[in-house]
Amino acid sequence: MRTGFDRDLYVRMQSQHINERREQIGGKLYLEMGGKLFDDLHASRVLPGFTPDNKIAMLEQLKDELEILVTINAKDLQRNKTRADLDISYEDDVLRLIDVFREAGFLTEHVVLTQLEDDNYQAMQFIQRLERLGIKVARHRVIPGYPTDARRIVSEEGFGRNEYVETTRNLVVVTAPGPGSGKLATCLSQIYGDHQRGISSGYAKFETFPIWDLPLEHPVNLAYEAATADLDDINVIDPFHLTAYGEKATSYNRDVEVFPLLKTMLEMLSGSSPYQSPTDMGVNMVGSAIADDEVCREAARQEIVRRYFKALVDERRDELDDTVSSRIAIVMSKAGCSVEDRTVVARALELESETGAPASAILLDDGRIVTGKTSALLGCSAAMLLNALKELAGIDPSIDLLSPESIEPIQTLKTEHLGSRNPRLHTDEVLIALSVSAAASDNARRALDQLKNLRGCDVHTTTILGSVDEGIFRNLGVLVTSEPKYQRKALYRKR
């Protein structure tokens, strides 16, 4: 895979720039970390060479000087919001993040629930769960007039109603499972609380996307717009930066909307603001570490198309209108890409048309496309997986990695003893069968050794995947899209 991003340069530059901002601010610094802090899979897809743990690697250089504060929007608990890339709820992701941060040696003791209301039963239950686990919880309330009514917000009737988090270090990283979690409001509330206690503190923002020093409609920035289409976030030219410096910089609507509040609040608390624009608040050095712009552009265009298919599937699965997919269609148009640019789509659809049954296609790293069709023994994704492993291992396509005799007993187990209606093997079942065969078969061993080479490959299926196949592909690091239709008609769908 071609690399478009210099990871080592980024780690050095970013940690240095954060330290420079700390010196500039003085006192305690609340650093809002946008995007995923530990496993930023979106960034790794649109910036080839950016590893999912890049931000943690950078923060490890500051580990002994910082603590991490995790926020979650209480309304996301009511909505049962999930992280699509990991298929876990935001509630569980909060616990997972705390575990990950602690295992890496970061001080992580507090969770802030934002936009909390007394009738939010799910949030109250989560608070009890956190407290039973020994995690300190701060409750931040819905503030009428936020973010426009600065005088009310910066008062006892606004931030004054929020519970204050007693932090112990001078660099506080504020992160969350996803966007819209209230990270900025948490930082501002803490600065207000510090001011009431005579503590000097300031704010800076580390948001990977949009990248401020790339053009507004650069595909990498547009991919972020596609990723947040459900929030109706849009990239904008920072009007405050343009006015103050006469320079164009890329920001996004929520930062621009809340900037007057931040500036007013800092002026109310300390007499002046160090920032003239939302862009000034940022410490993001990602743009400076892009080593090959065209590689990143193409990766971003592919991500936008993947987001489009995901939106279509979500709308079909959850019986939603086409609001999100329509927004992403507009983004695709801006980026100059379409579903035809995802080459596996046409191949999968062609095979489905030829066979009259669901089909799959995978694009290998060297450009070869391998397909899989539905048969009496295998589902199309399982067949495609075996075919891809044979191709990578240089095994003759006519050779069966799994004999019909080894598959049939598994089918009998499924249908006669485990209550399955579908006798065909799924991806997890063929991998287990392949692992068993590897004890006696050199071909099976060689095929299994190629699993690592599937990471980052693109797959398209002509029907919506079941949860098992979806999970296997996710664990293998395969980037899957599907047509927004089910293999069979039914009212009940197992999730």
UniProtKB/Swiss-Prot annotation:
Q: Which cysteines are cross-linked by disulfides? A: none
So which domain of life are we looking at? Bacteria
User: What's a Pfam family in this record?
Assistant: DUF1846_C
Q: Which InterPro entries match?
A: DUF1846 (IPR014999), DUF1846_C (IPR048441), DUF1846_N (IPR048496)
- Which family does this protein fall into? Belongs to the UPF0371 family.
What's the protein here called?
Answer: UPF0371 protein CE2832
